[in-house]
């Protein structure tokens, strides 16, 4: 990378990243460097949601490189997704008017329930399109969409529920990172992902109480809708990456949720 020659920083690619994230070292200083991240990162840093932003530079080839404070620590375990701190942090993000204004300012996109269905059907393989359980789920979601309660307002949603995106530092600071999927959406969009992907680890009622959710009938309907929708999207992703064992397990879980609904 030309940036090393231009600045004297030594870059070490990080595992799990596709040439986008590095540990940068220069004169015993260590930073987390990432190419072409969202301009929204500055607001996240100011709000203490992501590690402190140190600087932003443009490289000679036109890439934007951001540098953040290097945090020694670890990502959360799956079982830790049930922590009160996770739910409370997510609520703080959803409730932040500052983040909402900043995301709008940098051109953040609005993502609605119908966009989820469009995303699912785009490029959907025939094996999934005609699978009886998945077909039943899509018919149910389409039917419910017509009368799905509309949220009073959209908020900043992270858009990628994963324990690997939660960083717990050695100083016990909790950060939510990797904001490439951020959108303005129904808070149930984020929450439905967590309830779908971590249904075995999260006690739903306890977690929703920690989030301080207003558990109206309308909100529960939206949560249930997004939980089914996110399950379908995850099944599609598992199929596309040939993770068939995981896909089959998710289909079994999806079928249980459908039976609870109908």
What is the role of each PLM region?
Residues 2-5, 98-159, 256, 261:
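An alpha-helical support segment within catalytic cores of ATP-dependent transferases
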Residues 4-12:
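Conserved N-terminal boundary motif of the eukaryotic protein kinase catalytic domain
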Residues 11-103:
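ATP-binding pocket architecture of kinase catalytic cores
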Residues 21-24, 143-189:
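Active-site acidic catalytic loop and adjacent metal/ATP-binding pocket
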Residues 50, 90, 114-117, 204, ...:
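A general structural signal for well-ordered alpha-helical segments in protein cores
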Residues 59-79, 114-126, 231-244:
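A glycine-centered beta->alpha junction motif in the catalytic cores
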Residues 169-220:
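Active-site Asp-x-Gly
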Residues 196-198, 210-262:
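Helix-rich C-terminal or lid/interface subdomains of diverse kinases
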